[in-house]
Amino acid sequence: MANVKLFDQTGKEVSTVELNDAIFGIEPNESVVFDVVISQRASLRQGTHAVKNRSAVSGGGRKPWRQKGTGRARQGSIRSPQWRGGGVVFGPTPRSYGYKLPQKVRRLALKSVYSAKVAEDKFVAVESLSFAAPKTAEFAKVLSALSIDTKVLVLVEEGNEFAALSARNLPNVAVATAATASVLDIVSADKLLVTKEAISTIEEVLA
């Protein structure tokens, strides 16, 4: 099993933590990661685009002129697509762009991105992130002590609200629970800051 250094909130190395090689030590599958990221980005699309077809455009209920005898081309409605102000043909309608990939694929993608972060030395383990109250300055001190000055995703255990509240005003810092962090969240960050309890949660979820 791979070992990573374990720090406290002051940036002092206190021990090491063993990582499960089946989760944090596999050969990253870039193709699977790509597929999952595309899927998750597609799910974020609003899909609220819409146009009016000939049935939705106001007016046009009356035939503009009689069928025969005028010498003009026959028309049934002034809201037909060929008319100015008419309806749109085959335009976009509201829809969901989301689609689901198999659970095995999603799990492999998570293992791949975690393994990549560990291999690239972009995985920082911290004993805990506990705050007496939500304080942005206190969280900033922790990041400074750990020499983290790039875009970071902080993974905490369920129920650690003060950590999330303390970090939300900091630029380039995102907080998620270990059980709900997505592949897109992880690949979007330069580094991962993970609590010891969150590591255990990740290993439980992906075991």
From Swiss-Prot:
Keyword rRNA-binding attached = yes
Keyword entries, A-Z: Ribonucleoprotein, Ribosomal protein, RNA-binding, rRNA-binding
Q: Which GO terms describe its molecular function?
A: rRNA binding; structural constituent of ribosome
Give the record's GO CC terms.
ribonucleoprotein complex; ribosome
Q: Region (Disordered): which ranges?
A: 49-78
Entry's Gene Ontology BP terms: translation
Q: Which Pfam families match?
A: Ribosomal_L4
Q: What does the similarity note say?
A: Belongs to the universal ribosomal protein uL4 family.
- Assembly state and interactors? Part of the 50S ribosomal subunit.
Q: What role does this protein play?
A: One of the primary rRNA binding proteins, this protein initially binds near the 5'-end of the 23S rRNA. It is important during the early stages of 50S assembly. It makes multiple contacts with different domains of the 23S rRNA in the assembled 50S subunit and ribosome.
Q: Which PANTHER family match?
A: 50S RIBOSOMAL PROTEIN L4, LARGE RIBOSOMAL SUBUNIT PROTEIN UL4M
Report what the protein is called: Large ribosomal subunit protein uL4
Q: Which organism does this sequence originate in?
A: Streptococcus equi subsp. zooepidemicus (strain MGCS10565)
